[in-house]
Amino acid sequence: MAQEYLDFELPIAELEAKIESLRSVASQDDEINLDDEIARLQKKSAELTKKTFANLDAWQVSKMARHPNRPYTLDYIERIFTEFEELAGDRAFADDKAIVGGLARLDGKPVMVIGHQKGRSVKDKVKRNFGMPAPEGYRKALRLMQMAERFNLPIITFIDTPGAYPGVGAEERGQSEAIARNLREMSTLKVPVICTVIGEGGSGGALAIGVGDKVNMLQYSTYSVISPEGCASILWKSAEKASTAAEVMGLTANRLKELNLIDSIIEEPLGGAHRDFDAMAHNLKQRLLDDLKELEMLDEDNLLHRRYNRLMDYGYC
């Protein structure tokens, strides 16, 4: 996968291009030793990356959440879980590829894992509908959650969508009903539910698999009722005000943690999750294991009571 860079990463990209050029020259001639120069540039690149990412604004974080190289649900499933067995279809209409899910093991423990899935190639993006589920996607997710409840399996969800698909067909098949039903049913599931925003957390399309006992966010993910561009178009009649909208929307992990709307912020590798899939997966896995250990100590009544109180606290100052 070719590395892509965002606008504020371009100075870093220039340094890394120089490093690759020197490596190429050195590999073609054994008599040329460029190790010292390469090491100097690598140190400079690391320092610049650290400085760049030390104080990203909300708009830059929004861009990071959408980074085309960012790991998706299946990337994490491959690195965190074993024996993953994908389950398909909502048993009513179709199998929506924008949501994937199935049985797996987390450190040997059986779990149900569900998440939004975007595509990499043009063909895969179309197949996955750019990570925007239709009603059948949410109904598939609910089917798997109810299956997990029957077999007393913890549920782990990964959220990464710009929003539910707003097409005519999706509306005709009951998009709003599918989302609303998921919200209701997830609030009363009798097994632990751990939700993590790994990229974009867009509106009801994200919330439909986001009601849980623990809600976490990756460091450079976002969670909001609308995109910054959409908000800017409504309030300022111009999508060019997206950066301003991002600042006032409070969509970053840090801001949502301040508001007690999420439980934990999972640190990303220097430069973002896309720089090191394995390191990011390691951090995420540890968070999931810690959360699961805590939740498994609760009996069913306490689990549901705590989840109910959590939901009732939303919106209070």
UniProtKB/Swiss-Prot annotation:
Q: What does this protein do?
A: Component of the acetyl coenzyme A carboxylase (ACC) complex. First, biotin carboxylase catalyzes the carboxylation of biotin on its carrier protein (BCCP) and then the CO(2) group is transferred by the carboxyltransferase to acetyl-CoA to form malonyl-CoA.
What is said about its interaction partners and assembly? Acetyl-CoA carboxylase is a heterohexamer composed of biotin carboxyl carrier protein (AccB), biotin carboxylase (AccC) and two subunits each of ACCase subunit alpha (AccA) and ACCase subunit beta (AccD).
Question: How is this protein named in the record?
Answer: Acetyl-coenzyme A carboxylase carboxyl transferase subunit alpha
Q: Which residue intervals define the domain CoA carboxyltransferase C-terminal in the entry?
A: 33-294
Task: Report the gene name.
Answer: accA
Identify the EC number(s). 2.1.3.15
UniProt-recorded Gene Ontology molecular function terms? acetyl-CoA carboxylase activity; ATP binding; carboxyl- or carbamoyltransferase activity
Query: What's the domain of life for this entry?
Result: Bacteria
Q: Does the record's keyword annotation contain Transferase?
A: yes
Q: What species is given as this protein's source?
A: Pasteurella multocida (strain Pm70)
Q: Name one GO biological process term.
A: malonyl-CoA biosynthetic process
Q: Where in the cell is it found?
A: Cytoplasm
Keyword field contains Repeat:
no
Q: Which reaction does it catalyse?
A: N(6)-carboxybiotinyl-L-lysyl-[protein] + acetyl-CoA = N(6)-biotinyl-L-lysyl-[protein] + malonyl-CoA
Q: Name the family.
A: Belongs to the AccA family.
